[in-house]
């Protein structure tokens, strides 16, 4: 356990995990599993929009996070503008992109590369 509690760095794994459960339920004809997967996928996507990808004027976090339009790692007690493997801008924004499947088109309502180029990056975060 870390001093700042549990953490999550990338939304792509959780979205894809729940989407896989939806597909599994669909393939097996199990409506309960399918519906659970669909619900949890939509909740994860909403969380990604609310807590990882920020649009102008919409943020759960103060500047400089809102200025950068992204959060790298969310902890139980804090947020970081970094990843486990580095603090490069492209790492922080593009960690949300890795597994490009159909559901990711919905999750990435904003282009992380465009957000990065629009954001006044603060390296001291």
Predicted regions and their residues:
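Alpha-helix C-terminal capping/termination sites
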Residues: 23-30
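Residues within HEAT/ARM-like alpha-solenoid scaffolds
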Residues: 12, 32-35
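Ser/Thr/Asn(+Pro)-rich, low-complexity disordered segments
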Residues: 1-3, 28, 35-125
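Well-ordered alpha-helical segments within folded domains of soluble proteins
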Residues: 9-23
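Catalytic cores of eukaryotic secretory-pathway lumenal/extracellular enzymes that build
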Residues: 2-10
């Amino acid at each position: 356990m870390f001093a700042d509690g549990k953490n999550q760095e990338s939304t792509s794994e959780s979205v894809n995990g729940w989407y896989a459960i939806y597909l599994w339920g669909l393939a097996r004809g199990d409506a309960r599993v399918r519906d659970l997967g669909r619900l949890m996928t939509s909740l994860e996507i909403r969380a990604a929009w609310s807590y990882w990808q920020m649009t102008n004027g919409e943020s759960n976090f103060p500047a400089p996070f809102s200025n950068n339009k992204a959060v790298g790692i969310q902890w139980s007690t804090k947020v970081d503008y970094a990843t486990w493997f580095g603090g490069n801008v492209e790492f922080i924004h593009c960690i949300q992109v890795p597994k490009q499947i159909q559901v990711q088109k919905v999750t990435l309502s904003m282009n992380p590369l465009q957000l990065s180029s629009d954001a006044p990056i603060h390296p001291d975060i």
